């Protein structure tokens, strides 16, 4: 950290022992044990992505233990930056939350990449993600440097100066262009970086400096249209006149990008990304669309169980017949919205019952039944 300048307040400096104790308190689990914890916490499906992410979490813990418990510098080339690609509702950010907020319990920030802007323009400077990491780490820069930054909607940073078109949205929206990508390029490779402790709202504090050798950066995005772009390259399609527009392929929203397609840096470049930025991610993990069986498990083990607990507190037993579960899963598959579509279908129905019966402590215990009648879900209390 640079010396304090006149008129600027220095950052607080917590003791090294605080960080050491926090790191020592994290339970050391093998990648297989981490994967098992994911199941215990309700994560379903995505076996390949789970394996990759469990190893990512294990390596993250190993790095911070090496630094703070063994007193050894990070091994060269061990920094992990990971790119999660897959359709909406496939469990990308949920996996990050469970791994790093729940299992490892290290400082974790989920940032919306569409809010980033190039320095000097309206919007969040890229380095403000470090400000947020500093905040969730109780304003302890050393503890923050043990954390994880997850940038969601990363695919929306694709510049419009390409032939990329977001399938399903029919737009070539350019949120921030190459400027933000260049800023991220530096952040993902720099050994350390300055950050505004107050998010840049005032100039009373000197900039903080955070060591980044142990910070794991994860980018998440649907990358709708990337598969069609990669397949076009495989067919030898060219740029310019005579090329079939990408949108004409009518690619489904929920698609699975193969490992071979992930290796095509040219596909990312045509999509609208600087090849060097994609190269900063040493692991690209593809998430598959969730199938009916997995959605059924998520519906039963996560969505319905949460609703059952809520309604039970209000004196209502929630009962959902199998036909309703199949209907809800089928609608989520049709919408291609993955696990998000499950709650979207149930929420309006259950909100009506909640409006009528929540907060009325004088009512006797009752049962709320969801049934399927003529293709429509009905909710009745009796």
What do these predicted regions represent?
Residues 2-45, 50-109, 114-135, 139-382:
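AAA+ P-loop NTPase nucleotide-binding core of proteostasis motors
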């Amino acid at each position: 950290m640079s010396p304090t300048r006149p008129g600027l307040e220095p950052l607080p400096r917590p003791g090294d022992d605080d960080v050491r104790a926090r790191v020592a308190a994290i339970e050391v689990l093998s990648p297989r044990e981490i994967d098992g914890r994911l199941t215990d916490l309700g994560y379903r499906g995505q076996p390949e992505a789970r394996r990759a992410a469990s190893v990512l979490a294990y390596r993250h813990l190993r790095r911070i233990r090496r630094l703070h418990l063994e007193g050894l510098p990070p091994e060269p080339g061990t920094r992990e930056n990971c790119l999660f690609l897959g359709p909406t509702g496939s469990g990308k950010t949920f996996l990050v939350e469970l791994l790093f907020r729940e299992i490892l319990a290290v400082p974790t920030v989920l940032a919306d990449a569409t809010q980033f802007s190039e320095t000097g323009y309206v919007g969040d400077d890229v380095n403000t993600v470090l400000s947020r990491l500093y905040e969730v780490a109780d304003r302890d820069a050393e503890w923050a440097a043990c954390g994880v930054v997850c940038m969601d909607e990363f695919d929306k940073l694709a510049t419009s100066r390409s032939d990329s078109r977001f399938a399903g949205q029919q737009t070539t929206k350019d949120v921030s262009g190459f400027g933000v990508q260049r800023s991220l390029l530096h952040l993902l490779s720099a050994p350390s970086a300055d950050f505004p402790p107050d998010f840049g709202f005032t100039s009373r504090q000197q900039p903080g400096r955070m060591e980044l050798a142990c910070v794991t950066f994860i980018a998440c995005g649907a990358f709708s249209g990337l598969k069609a772009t990669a397949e076009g390259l495989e067919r030898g399609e060219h740029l310019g006149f005579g090329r079939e527009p990408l949108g004409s392929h009518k690619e489904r929203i929920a698609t699975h990008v193969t490992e071979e397609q992930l290796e095509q840096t040219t596909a990312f470049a045509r999509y609208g990304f600087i090849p060097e930025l994609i190269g900063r991610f040493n692991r690209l993990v593809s998430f598959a669309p969730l199938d009916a069986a997995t959605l059924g498990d998520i519906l039963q083990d996560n969505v319905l169980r949460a609703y059952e607990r809520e309604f039970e507190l209000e004196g209502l037993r929630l009962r959902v017949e199998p036909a309703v579960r199949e209907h809800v899963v089928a609608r989520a598959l049709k919408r291609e919205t993955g696990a998000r579509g499950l709650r979207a279908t149930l929420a309006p129905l259950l909100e009506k019952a909640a409006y009528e019966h929540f907060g009325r402590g004088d009512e006797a215990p009752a049962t709320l039944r969801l049934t399927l009648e003529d293709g429509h879900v009905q909710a009745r209390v009796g």
